């Protein structure tokens, strides 16, 4: 058995009047990410982590922001596509560990639904997905509430 790890990162500016989609679910808030798709930083970073671990490129290769068909797209579609590519190469997703970095809102109460949405898209048991949230304690664009970021590590076996 071969084990591979991939790392993903994503960051989006936040703007008023946009939906806040994180981990595949909408979270009530007055701001949301500015992006070509729905701006789901967890799904984007997770997609990059999975593709990177498998040596299959990155989210921009598969879903370029220059392609109008991805405008406003649900980022869970990106995860479903990544899962199909992994299946074709016989990779197994062993574990996903994600951290979302934002000042507000508090995400802990939303983790169960986020985990369910991500697990469903990847066809995984929810216990293979771990989520955490951190703040930047007022430092930089994330700390000032101007942006949201996520970092994800994915472990695959072959």
Regions found by a protein language model. Name each.
Residues 125-128:
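Short acidic capping loops at alpha-helix termini that bridge into adjacent secondary structure
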Residues 131-135:
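Pyridoxal 5′-phosphate
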Residues 2-113, 117, 122:
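RNase III-family endoribonuclease catalytic core
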Residues 1-3, 157-158:
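N-terminal charge/polar-biased segments
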Residues 30-31, 139-141:
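A generic structural signal for short coil/turn motifs at secondary-structure boundaries
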Residues 142-158:
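C-terminal edge-of-domain segments
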Residues 6-8, 137-140:
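Glycine-rich, charged/polar anion/phosphate-binding loops
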Residues 109-110, 140, 144:
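Acidic (Asp/Glu) carboxylate-rich active-site/surface patches
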């Amino acid at each position: 058995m071969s084990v591979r790890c991939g790392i993903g990162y994503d960051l989006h500016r936040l703007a008023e009047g946009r939906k806040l989609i994180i981990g595949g679910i909408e979270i009530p808030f007055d701001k949301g990410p500015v992006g070509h798709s729905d701006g789901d930083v967890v799904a984007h970073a997770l997609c990059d982590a999975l593709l990177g671990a498998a040596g299959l490129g990155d989210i921009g290769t598969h879903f370029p922001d220059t392609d109008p068909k991805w405008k406003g797209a649900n980022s869970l579609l990106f995860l479903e596509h990544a899962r199909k590519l992994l299946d074709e190469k016989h990779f197994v997703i062993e574990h996903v560990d994600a951290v979302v970095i934002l000042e507000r809102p508090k995400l802990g109460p939303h983790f169960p639904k986020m985990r369910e949405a991500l697990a469903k898209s990847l066809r995984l048991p929810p216990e293979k997905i771990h989520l955490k949230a951190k703040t930047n304690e007022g430092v930089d664009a994330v700390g000032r509430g101007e942006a949201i970021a996520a970092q994800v590590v994915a472990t695959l076996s072959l």
